Amino acid sequence: MSKIPVIVIVGPTAVGKTSLSIELAKKLDGEIISGDSMQVYRGLDIGTAKITSEEMCGIKHHLIDVTDASVPFTAAKFQSETMALIESIHSRGKLPIIVGGTGLYIQSVFYDYDFGNSSEDKAFRAKLDSLDKVTLWKMLEQQDPESAKLIHENNKRRVIRALEVIHLTGKPFSEYQVHHKLNDMYKPLFLGLDLDRALLYERINQRVDIMFEQGLVSEAKKLYDENLADVPAIRGIGYKELFTYFEGNSTLEEAKELIQKNSRHFAKRQLTWFRNRMEINWIQAGTSSTETEAMNKVKTFLASK
């Protein structure tokens, strides 16, 4: 059975993944699967820079607005949904194109991946849950430095799960998850967009400015009024900072600056993940030849056996 070809476009936030994916999909008769852990949630539009129906240009998109913010959408769920979508898109004679910046989600589709769901130790988890974020992250850094580089200390839920897996298996979380063996069902081409760090950070700051102009504060306030502060989806950048403002613990300008700062740090972590975890064909973003270079790589890839 021949492997299904899949184009995968990755890179940091604000680098230009969406526009490139649309152009490739137009020319290659493709359908796009969002590889973004936040864009699956309805009501989180401005803060996630979610593509609009106009921007889709008639290209069919998948895994956008599929669940309410109160219902968690896990990496395991993304893995199963995406694998089914790849089969469906391919069976209709279309080219599957995955685009996004959530490395864990995208990687789970193409590599032998174990989420460590076989067992739990509720008592151990409760003990971890009673500890503060900094203490937990330092524990992870000591036990599994590789995972600590890729999981932010503010992501308490993910840090706890990593420590729990280490406790249950006796192995580092990073080793338990990925064995770096490609799934033999697919033939992926990983395209990564990169940009000069100063230019990328400038784009990120400008994007946040535009989000505020588009009504991010109102969008976040609606979610805040629905008492969703403790929902995992709301812990994403752009919402948690504004919730702090709504609670009177910061000014609006401080919240905005923190969103920009956290977004820049997130972009740096995204690049670290993709460079360390996946074999990517890197392309310089923001140039007149970006699309042409990407298209040439895709054509060569599709022509190969």
Curated annotation (Swiss-Prot):
<comment type="function">
    <text>Catalyzes the transfer of a dimethylallyl group onto the adenine at position 37 in tRNAs that read codons beginning with uridine, leading to the formation of N6-(dimethylallyl)adenosine (i(6)A).</text>
</comment>
<dbReference type="InterPro" id="IPR039657">
    <property type="entry name" value="Dimethylallyltransferase"/>
</dbReference>
<feature type="site" description="Interaction with substrate tRNA">
    <location>
        <position position="102"/>
    </location>
</feature>
<feature type="region of interest" description="Interaction with substrate tRNA">
    <location>
        <begin position="36"/>
        <end position="39"/>
    </location>
</feature>
<keyword id="KW-0460">Magnesium</keyword>
<dbReference type="Pfam" id="PF01715">
    <property type="entry name" value="IPPT"/>
</dbReference>
<comment type="subunit">
    <text>Monomer.</text>
</comment>
<keyword id="KW-0808">Transferase</keyword>
<keyword id="KW-0547">Nucleotide-binding</keyword>
<dbReference type="GO" id="GO:0052381">
    <property type="term" value="F:tRNA dimethylallyltransferase activity"/>
</dbReference>
<feature type="binding site">
    <location>
        <begin position="11"/>
        <end position="18"/>
    </location>
    <ligand>
        <name>ATP</name>
    </ligand>
</feature>
<keyword id="KW-0819">tRNA processing</keyword>
<dbReference type="InterPro" id="IPR018022">
    <property type="entry name" value="IPT"/>
</dbReference>
<comment type="similarity">
    <text>Belongs to the IPP transferase family.</text>
</comment>
<feature type="site" description="Interaction with substrate tRNA">
    <location>
        <position position="125"/>
    </location>
</feature>
<dbReference type="GO" id="GO:0006400">
    <property type="term" value="P:tRNA modification"/>
</dbReference>
<protein>
    <recommendedName>
        <fullName>tRNA dimethylallyltransferase</fullName>
        <ecNumber>2.5.1.75</ecNumber>
    </recommendedName>
</protein>
<feature type="binding site">
    <location>
        <begin position="13"/>
        <end position="18"/>
    </location>
    <ligand>
        <name>substrate</name>
    </ligand>
</feature>
<keyword id="KW-0067">ATP-binding</keyword>
<dbReference type="InterPro" id="IPR027417">
    <property type="entry name" value="P-loop_NTPase"/>
</dbReference>
<dbReference type="GO" id="GO:0005524">
    <property type="term" value="F:ATP binding"/>
</dbReference>
